[in-house]
């Protein structure tokens, strides 16, 4: 509707339109995924986002609108919604740190994502919308980590080293020091159609927009854990 409004009001030269696309559109396409990678959406969310991607391109090509897609890989911050896996982990660790809970449950430990910081990606979005012409860009760090990696790094922020025992649904994460169970796997948190491995290639954005992420994955995880620990204190 926004694109059609721009067209019917003859505002093509006055309005720049940015569509927030997602790396989930790539689905099972092998990494690294770039602007040229085949889309294979594996969820209703990804399919809907793919429609938005193509309608944006269509209006750009058909009506000469300044309409562009930013295909953003996972970007996190302490403001991430509480239903997302990264925030579930950091909030659970804050609860464990403060003695509110002893363990938590999680889904696929081996799903790999290209996680960056929202601050870097907002800067990238600004660069996309201010580029000299409308184009589509992938924004990504080029590095991929598993949910398991995220858990291990996050627990180290409270002085706990994890070790893993078991396989599949029976796998558990233990405190290496006292052998207490901290993480269990629950099939309820698995996706019906999982996306196993996302890792972006943002070379186009680096070349044309002079954009590159500044905040490393470990620093991102550390910031999120510390923020949730502090939030717990303030409750």
Enumerate the predicted regions with their spans.
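N-terminal Rossmann-like NAD(P)+-binding domain of SDR-like oxidoreductases, especially those catalyzing
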Residues: 1-77, 119, 125, 129, ...
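C-terminal substrate-binding subdomain of Rossmann-fold SDR/epimerase-dehydratase oxidoreductases
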Residues: 82-235
């Amino acid at each position: 509707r926004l694109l059609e409004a721009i067209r019917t009001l003859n505002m093509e030269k006055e309005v720049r339109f940015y569509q927030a696309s997602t790396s989930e559109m790539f689905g099972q396409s092998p990494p690294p995924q770039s602007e040229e990678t085949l889309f294979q959406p594996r969820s209703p969310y990804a399919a809907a986002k793919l429609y938005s991607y193509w309608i944006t391109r269509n209006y750009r090509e058909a009506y000469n609108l300044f309409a562009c897609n930013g295909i953003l890989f996972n970007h996190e911050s302490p403001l991430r919604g509480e239903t997302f896996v990264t925030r579930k982990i950091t909030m659970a660790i804050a609860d464990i740190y403060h003695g509110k809970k002893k363990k938590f449950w999680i889904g696929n430990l081996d799903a790999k994502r290209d996680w960056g910081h929202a601050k870097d990606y907002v800067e990238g979005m600004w660069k996309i919308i201010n580029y000299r012409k409308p184009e589509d860009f992938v924004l990504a760090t080029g590095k991929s980590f598993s949910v398991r990696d995220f858990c291990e790094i996050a627990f180290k922020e409270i002085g706990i080293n994890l070790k893993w025992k078991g396989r599949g649904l029976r796998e558990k994460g233990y405190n290496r020091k006292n052998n207490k169970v901290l993480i269990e796997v629950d099939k309820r948190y698995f996706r019906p159609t999982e996306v196993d491995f996302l890792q972006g290639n943002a070379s186009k954005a680096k070349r044309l927009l002079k954009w590159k992420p500044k905040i490393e994955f470990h620093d991102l995880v550390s910031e999120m854990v510390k923020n949730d620990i502090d939030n717990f204190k303030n409750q």
